[in-house]
A protein has these predicted regions:
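Hydrophobic core of transmembrane alpha-helices in multi-pass small-molecule transporters
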Residues: 22, 91, 102-118
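Short amphipathic helix-loop junctions that connect adjacent transmembrane helices
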Residues: 33-49
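Helix-breaking motifs and short loop linkers at transmembrane-helix boundaries and internal kinks
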Residues: 44, 76, 97-102
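Central cavity-lining transmembrane alpha-helices of secondary-active solute carriers
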Residues: 55-70
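C-terminal ends and interior cores of transmembrane alpha-helices
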Residues: 86-100
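Intracellular juxtamembrane helix-capping segments at the cytosolic ends
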Residues: 117-131
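Glycine-rich segments within core transmembrane alpha-helices of 12-TM secondary carriers
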Residues: 136-148
Length: 148
């Protein structure tokens, strides 16, 4: 059974949202891989503290979207992504500049908040950019991007 050409057509916002998700995930996983080592060697935490901070960072970035989703709906796609990537840029930029736990904690919080604004926008855009005929394909593309 061949897929119709229209089932592959999505608005530009759909593809932009998926590209944004791909960039956010690449930045998150790239940071998460090195975070514990950074906390140990640069910030000076011990193993337990570094593990706790890294685990908390990972947990919060998945918990906060439950709260930021409503705000993202009110702000809209464009403003939410601008806010999200502004927070992410500030957070990731600050991580490279500071070497004590206070500023590093604030930097990680900015990253968490930025990531929390990206997630609901992307899934909402996948839903709004699709119809009954191509919704499964839209979410398949979205989940493929998330899992790359």
């Amino acid at each position: 059974m061949a897929a119709s050409a229209s089932s592959w057509r999505f608005p530009r916002a759909f593809w932009t949202a998926n590209a944004a998700e791909l960039c956010e995930r690449a930045a998150y996983y790239g940071t998460f891989i090195a975070l514990r080592t950074y906390l140990l060697r640069v910030v000076g935490l011990d193993d337990v503290q570094a593990g706790f901070v890294a685990g908390l960072f990972g947990a919060l970035i998945y918990l906060f979207p439950f709260f930021t989703g409503a705000i993202s709906d009110r702000l809209g796609f464009r403003h939410s992504l601008i806010l999200a990537f502004g927070l992410l840029a500030a957070g990731y930029g600050a991580l490279g500049r500071f070497h004590t736990m206070g500023p590093v904690s604030l930097s990680l919080l900015l990253v968490v908040l930025g990531g929390a604004f990206v997630k609901p926008v992307i899934s909402g855009t996948a839903s709004k950019s699709s119809n009954e005929a191509n919704r499964a394909r839209a979410f398949s593309i979205f989940y493929m991007i998330v899992n790359i």
